[in-house]
A protein has these predicted regions:
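Non-heme di-metal
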Residues: 2-219
């Protein structure tokens, strides 16, 4: 972040929450090429952001349906689904305010490529799904923070402030998913986390032909 951007953010009273646990968790930061492209294509960013929030709520409900025997999962996923749907409605309102038509757009490769690596055993599949949930929430958190300085520079102060407000929520979801992954297995999850994070890093840093909120380097 440049001195000008830092000064602008402080003057406007916008503070990007520091989430060191996310920085320590992810293996890479968002490439600047993605940030630059996103700032020029905010309509796509917002549409896909809305879709991501809806999908996150759907994933939480799916986990509740598939694993009803886990009380703590039910509690956390109920709260998460409710919050994700609230965020979905907020982004829909932003789209309407901007005159952008909300629509379904084809998903990028990100989630699909990671989920292809789910283990086939029942417990392995379950734990992997929770770990991947944590990874996606962590990346969302990091991307919101990456966008804020450029949004302020472009005069998108309201959107920058909104994205700052989402950072702590996404970090909380990240922590919740990791907590559940550790809770429901007796084996250390660190090796599996490292393996899935390496896949995520490759997707974030490699060229990507379809620009989306979680896509790789635009090409």
């Amino acid at each position: 972040m440049s001195v000008i951007e830092t000064s602008s953010i402080e003057t406007l009273g916008i503070e990007i929450p520091a989430i060191p646990e996310i920085d320590a968790f992810l293996l890479c930061v968002t490439p600047q090429a993605w940030v630059d492209y996103a700032l020029k294509n905010l309509d796509v960013v917002l549409i896909d952001h809305a879709l991501c929030e809806k999908k996150a709520a759907s994933t939480a409900i799916s986990l509740m349906h598939r694993y009803p025997q886990y009380d703590e999962l039910l509690d956390k996923m109920t709260a998460l689904a409710r919050e994700e749907l609230t965020h979905f409605k907020q982004v829909i309102n932003l789209l309407r305010e901007r005159g952008i038509t909300y629509q379904n757009i084809a998903p990028g490769r990100y989630a699909g490529k990671i989920f292809k690596h789910l283990r086939t055993s029942e417990l392995g599949h379950f734990i992997d799904a929770l770990i991947i949930g944590a990874i996606i929430e962590a990346r969302s958190c990091e991307r919101f923070a990456a966008l804020v300085p450029g949004l302020v520079t472009q005069g998108e102060v309201a959107l920058a402030g909104y994205y700052c407000s989402l950072i702590k929520a996404e970090a909380r979801h990240f922590e919740g998913y990791l907590y559940l992954a550790e809770l429901y297995t007796d084996e250390p999850i660190a090796p599996r986390v490292a393996s899935l994070l390496a896949i995520e890093q490759q997707l974030i840093q490699s060229p990507d032909t379809k620009f989306r909120f979680h896509s790789g380097v635009p090409c």
